[in-house]
A protein has these predicted regions:
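ATP/NTP phosphate-donor binding region
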Residues: 1-72, 79
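Catalytic core of DAGKc-family lipid kinases
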Residues: 17, 40, 49, 87-203
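Short amphipathic alpha-helical segments
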Residues: 27-29, 82-85, 107-109, 214-215
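Short, solvent-exposed amphipathic alpha-helical segments in soluble enzyme
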Residues: 30-33, 86-87, 157-158, 217-220
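Catalytic phosphate-donor-binding core of small-molecule kinases
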Residues: 44, 124-125, 173-185, 223-240
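Phosphate- and divalent-cation-binding pockets in alpha/beta enzyme and binding domains
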Residues: 54-57, 80-81, 104-105, 151
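Short Gly/Thr/Asp-enriched flexible loops that form oxyanion-binding sites at enzyme active sites
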Residues: 77-89
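Internal anion-binding site segments
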Residues: 190, 197-240
Length: 240
């Protein structure tokens, strides 16, 4: 059960939904999630995205009017919400109910998909600070990457994701193998210079990338002000 929030006025919840996330499962959970917040004494206003960039725009235009901003969608939707927060300088707490296909962020933070648990944590937990990266003018929550398979998340058709879920990314990744090429990169990090031909590179703040690459938990902390850099060199031979 979810207790009521004690507040001089009903806590206003901005619920941002990506209806296509998770093969449409996020959309089908909307009513149950709204009822869970309302049963705790909250007033819920739902914003539904229709295209890329909507979530950031919603936050920048309306986020200041709410006590909590809750994202219901996948990693991409959460990234947009965080970008909107950073760009507008808001200090409104953000809650996340994972509803995507990969859910790397939720897995790294051990966030529950159970609605009652998720709503309770959003309303009553003390919350925590989290690092956000910035690349030129763009912000990212958990990874900024280049090279092999990085275009897959953008080019995988939504209809295919709706049908196959996470497997759609795998199929699209196989399709993209023929386009893989190395990038010559020079990187300075921690006063060290790394230069070479790389198939893949990522600046990340996560324990997993695309559910295919896992980082050791003892080296990763999402709130230490430090990002991890993952580089995969172009092999010199086929055996490598």
């Amino acid at each position: 059960s979810i207790q009521k929030v004690f507040c001089p006025e009903a806590p206003r919840i901005m619920l941002i939904l990506n209806p296509a996330a998770g093969r449409g499962r996020a959309f089908h959970r909307l009513s149950e999630i709204s009822r869970a917040f309302e049963s705790a004494g909250c007033k819920v206003t739902t914003f539904i995205t229709q295209k890329r960039g909507d979530a950031s725009r919603f936050v920048m235009e309306h986020g200041a009017d709410f006590h909590r901003i809750v994202c219901l969608g996948g990693d991409g939707t959460l990234n947009e919400v965080a970008s909107g927060i950073a760009r507008s300088g808001l200090s409104v707490p953000v809650g996340y109910i994972p509803g995507g296909s990969a859910n790397d962020f939720a897995r790294s933070h051990r966030l529950s998909r159970d609605i009652s648990v998720a709503v309770h944590e959003i309303l009553y937990s003390s919350g925590k600070q989290m690092d956000i990266g910035k690349l030129n003018t763009r912000y990212f929550v958990y990874v900024a990457a280049f090279g092999a398979f990085t275009r897959t998340s953008y080019t995988t058709p939504q209809a295919l994701k709706n049908t196959l879920g996470y497997a759609a990314y795998l199929l699209s990744g196989i399709r993209d193998i023929s386009t893989i090429k190395a990038e010559h990169i020079r990187i300075t990090a921690d006063s060290e210079v790394h230069e070479g031909n790389y198939l893949f590179g990522a600046i990340c703040n996560t324990l997993s990338i695309g559910r295919m690459i896992s980082l050791p938990t003892k080296f990763v902390a999402m709130d230490d002000g430090v990002f991890e850099v993952l580089l995969i060199r172009m092999p010199d031979t086929i055996l490598e």
